[in-house]
Design a protein with these regions (language model features):
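N-terminal cationic and glycine-rich segments that engage phosphates or anionic surfaces
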Residues: 1-105, 110-450
Length: 450
């Protein structure tokens, strides 16, 4: 406790870090306040049925969690940040196939800015498609016509589309500003704060269900909390675990502050078991809405009914099989993008370092690629198992669905991953200013090895 108090005092003493944290908290507060602002012309009291259904889990529960309740509230942020996530998926997938995007990726900062601009425009396009679908879909979700105070007129639809698109763009802007001037990844923090906002209600509903319905009582609640803590610890291990590649140096003339300098200090290259972080989960979850949507296009046909029945139930067999497969695929895909083994090999060669038994240059790059493939496969399976664990606990012990979403799956992994990433950034600021960090001996040394 004394160490935590000392760390808080240290954070307060560092002006830049203090301002970054306050800036982040302020923008997160703006986002949460916006999630409570209902679209003009919509009666919030008439949305109670949609809100209660979304609290019970299912696709509605995930949508509502990702938007922090904005989806069920028909808020100006009802679309949340998911259109931006979807746009990022498309751009990164196209970056593998389109020469133009591949060229931009190699142009450094200027290319990154152009890719960001393309992602923004694609986000707007997705918003324009999703906004009317959301407005017309409210009736299918059980919202009565009386909820629309002035009726669902063309003027109301047009105005609401503009507001929803603007809300998504504003949320995207908030996320980018947090990343640039705050602490942590802004987009991930927006999703996390929305998920955390739904946690107390989900736990309360599960507690009431266990006690009032004689469904295990407090003993079962205690067991669930114990299992939850174990899953959190396993998730932390997944995020933090690294494979250490030993490095030897023939000479030590590395430039201070560079990646090669850091390698020289620690005498090994740390390759993370889950180098892609939470992004495979977010990407896979974004695509999991597609099968049910495609099924609705086919209407009452056999294919349409099967798609809607199989992929609208997030605790069902087919949904979780596809979800797990997508998590594995995106883990490999995103790791290939985010781990620049060629650059690591070049930096190592320039600093006079080499992996024992491996020639510097291309052979080292191929070796690092091989090791990454070896550790990414079990890491992706580990990630997929945790991702589908909510469905397992629902089927095995009959847990309340809204609370089960926090037993692994998208919600827990995002919260754990974002929390660790944010803590590591705060830790880096503290260590750079010669204060004791949040981790005993630095973020890299505290990681478990495999």
């Amino acid at each position: 406790m004394n160490k935590l108090i000392d760390v808080i005092k240290s954070i307060y003493k560092i002006k830049e870090l203090r301002e970054r944290i306050l800036f982040t908290l302020a923008l997160l507060l703006v986002y949460r306040l916006g999630a409570q602002v209902v679209l003009p012309g919509v009666d919030s009291l008439a949305l109670s049925d949609l809100s209660s259904r979304s609290d019970g889990g299912g696709l509605l529960g995930i949508l509502n969690a990702f938007t922090g309740g904005a989806f069920a509230n028909a808020s100006i942020f009802a679309l949340g940040i998911m259109p931006y996530i979807s746009a990022s998926i498309v751009v990164q997938l196209m970056g593998v196939a389109l020469p133009y995007l591949q060229k931009l990726q190699k142009e450094g900062e200027s290319g990154r800015k152009k890719i960001t601009q393309i992602t923004r425009w694609l986000t707007i396009f997705i918003c324009v498609v999703q906004a009317p679908a959301y407005l017309y879909g409210l009736s299918a979700l059980g919202v009565p016509d009386s909820a629309f105070i002035f009726g669902r007129t063309p003027a109301f639809i047009f105005t609401s589309i503009i507001i929803l698109v603007t809300g998504c763009i504003f949320a995207m802007w908030l996320g980018e500003k947090i990343t640039d001037r705050g602490i942590g990844n802004g987009i991930s923090l927006l999703i996390t704060v929305g998920i955390v906002a739904t946690l107390p209600l989900s736990f309360t509903q599960n507690l009431i269900s266990r006690i009032s319905e004689s469904n295990g009582g407090l003993i079962m609640v205690v067991i669930e909390l114990a299992v939850w803590l174990v899953i959190i610890l396993l998730s932390i291990l997944l995020v933090m675990a690294v494979r250490q590649i030993p490095v030897q140096y023939a000479r030590r003339n590395s430039v201070p502050g560079t990646q090669s300098s850091e390698m020289a200090k620690r005498q090994y290259i740390p390759l993370k078991l889950n180098a892609s972080g939470v992004m495979p989960i977010i990407f896979a979850q974004a695509l999991m809405f597609a099968p049910a949507t495609i099924g609705s296009v086919f209407g009452t046909s056999a294919v349409g009914q099967w798609l809607q029945a199989s992929f609208s139930d997030i605790f069902g067999l087919w949904y979780n099989i596809l979800f797990g497969v997508l998590v594995v695929i995106f883990t490999f895909f995103y790791t290939a993008i985010t781990v620049p083994t060629n650059k690591m090999s070049d930096d190592l060669k320039r600093s006079g370092g080499f992996v024992p038994g491996i020639r510097p240059g291309n052979e080292t790059s191929e070796y690092l690629d091989s090791v990454m493939s070896q550790i990414t496969f079990p890491g992706s399976l580990y990630l997929a198992i945790i991702a589908v664990f909510p469905a397992i606990v629902v089927q095995l012990i009959g847990m309340q669905q809204g609370w089960a979403l926090f037993f692994g799956g998208t919600s827990l992994l995002i919260m754990v991953g974002v929390a660790i990433d944010t803590i590591q950034q705060v830790n880096a600021h503290l260590l750079n200013n010669h204060y004791d960090g949040l981790m005993k001996s630095g973020s890299m040394r505290s990681k478990p090895t495999i």
